[in-house]
Amino acid sequence: MLVTLLETFSVVFQVANGDGNCVPRFQDDVEFCDNYILEAVTEASKMIAPRAREQKLCCGFNKFTHCVTTASKKCSEAADRVKRVLDTKMTSLGVHCPDTNKVCNGGVNTSVSANTVTVYLLFSLGYFFYMNKL
C-alpha cells in the first residue's frame, strides 16, 4: 500500500505540474478542498457505527475529489489527466465507496476507495512540503 501511495503522489505531481507552474495556480483551492476531508475525518472519528463512519468518509472524499478536479481546471487539460490518474491508482486500492450520491448532501457520485482518504491526506501533506521548499 505504501508503494501505491508514493507512486500516486509522484504521478499526480508530475501530471498536475506538467507545464511547470500548474500547482501554484490552484494551491489555495486545494487547501480549501482539504477542509472536506478534514471535516469528514473529524466527524467520522466521533461515530460508533462502522458503516456510518465509512459513509461520512466517502461523502467527504467525494466532495474533495470534485473540488480538486474543479480547481485543477485552472491548468487546462490537467484536470482530466489528474482525475484519470487518480481514478486508476485509487481503484487499485480495492474497497470502493458505495453509491453515496443518495446519502450525501450534494455529493458527487464517483467510484473511489475509502482508503484513498489516507492517500489524499498524504498527498496534501507532501504537496505542502513540496510548496514550502520552492
Curated annotation (Swiss-Prot):
<feature type="signal peptide">
    <location>
        <begin position="1"/>
        <end position="18"/>
    </location>
</feature>
<feature type="propeptide">
    <location>
        <begin position="19"/>
        <end position="56"/>
    </location>
</feature>
<dbReference type="GO" id="GO:0005576">
    <property type="term" value="C:extracellular region"/>
</dbReference>
<keyword id="KW-0732">Signal</keyword>
<protein>
    <recommendedName>
        <fullName>U35-theraphotoxin-Cg1a</fullName>
    </recommendedName>
</protein>
<dbReference type="GO" id="GO:0090729">
    <property type="term" value="F:toxin activity"/>
</dbReference>
<keyword id="KW-0964">Secreted</keyword>
<comment type="function">
    <text>Probable secreted venom toxin.</text>
</comment>
<keyword id="KW-0800">Toxin</keyword>
